[in-house]
């Protein structure tokens, strides 16, 4: 699944290319998993994928995800255009690797194409680490209308992780478990 996701790096994203949920769905489809199989007719792509994980995997908020875990984000854009940070499940990606400092490298599709970007939940408001290396990418574009303190980094917009494949048997979905009440907010 990760090799299929990596093969998409650099390909067009956004309106003219592959969006985030289509990118993630295609990567998992390469491993024989249809992430839309539990979708409700009203679900958007990210919602459909989260529903699949809720039914066939595990939703969690650990600080140390595993490679292959999904990462969900809220408020990556103002979907309902009301100027309020109330837009749940607006983006997702795939954790490619996790570094010793806790920085997860996330593969996801943006308006600039499929990219690899960092997210560090240990330091959610920092853009760089002690050595100047990037640890949190901007996910929500800054606008002149943003109030002070509006979240922009991936880590600030983090809504939870989803595990589809179990560590012991990477090709097998994990047992069904539910996170009570969905991914909790910090």
Residue ranges and their predicted role:
Residues 81-186:
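Aromatic- and glycine-rich peptidoglycan recognition patches
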Residues 1-42, 50-54, 149-186:
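N-terminal capping segments
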Residues 36-117:
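...with weaker cross-activation on analogous glycine-rich loops/strands in unrelated enzymes
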């Amino acid at each position: 699944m990760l090799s299929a996701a990596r093969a998409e790096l650099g390909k067009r994203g956004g309106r003219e290319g592959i969006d985030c949920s289509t990118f993630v769905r295609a990567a998992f489809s390469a491993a024989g998993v249809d992430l839309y199989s539990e979708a409700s007719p009203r679900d958007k792509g990210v919602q459909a994928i989260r529903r699949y994980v809720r039914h066939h995997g595990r939703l969690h908020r650990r600080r140390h995800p595993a490679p292959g875990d999904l990462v969900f984000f809220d408020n990556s854009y103002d979907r309902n255009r009301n100027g309020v940070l109330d837009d749940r499940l607006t983006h997702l990606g795939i954790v490619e690797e996790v570094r010793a400092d806790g920085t997860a490298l996330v593969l996801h599709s943006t308006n600039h194409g499929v990219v690899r970007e960092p997210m560090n939940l240990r330091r959610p408001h920092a853009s760089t680490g002690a050595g100047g290396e990037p640890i949190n990418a901007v996910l929500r574009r800054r606008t002149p209308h943003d109030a002070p303190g509006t979240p922009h980094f991936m880590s600030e917009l983090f809504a939870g992780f989803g595990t589809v494949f179990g560590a012991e048997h990477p090709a097998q979905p994990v047992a069904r478990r539910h996170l009570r009440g969905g991914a909790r907010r910090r």
